[in-house]
């Protein structure tokens, strides 16, 4: 089960995230626990594999918002980086950046078990 201390170790700005949830720790942890199942991770990966930069941008931008709202800073930074590259339709190999994001998602999923 996920804890505030585990999230802090993970790189989340828990105090900021709790502030957005009006100090309701149970609500904050419940919302964070939904992140690994967020469908936009799959959409981002699939869009990149299909070289669909518009679809990848939409997925990354949505993830950026959710991760930012929950102050999952380490994940947010990775997603914000790829979002800006996709916004400008930068033609690069995104596979390493997507892998970093998916690894962070998987690490968070383990914390949520």
Positions of PLM-derived features:
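Two-component system phosphorelay core
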Residues: 1-58, 62-113
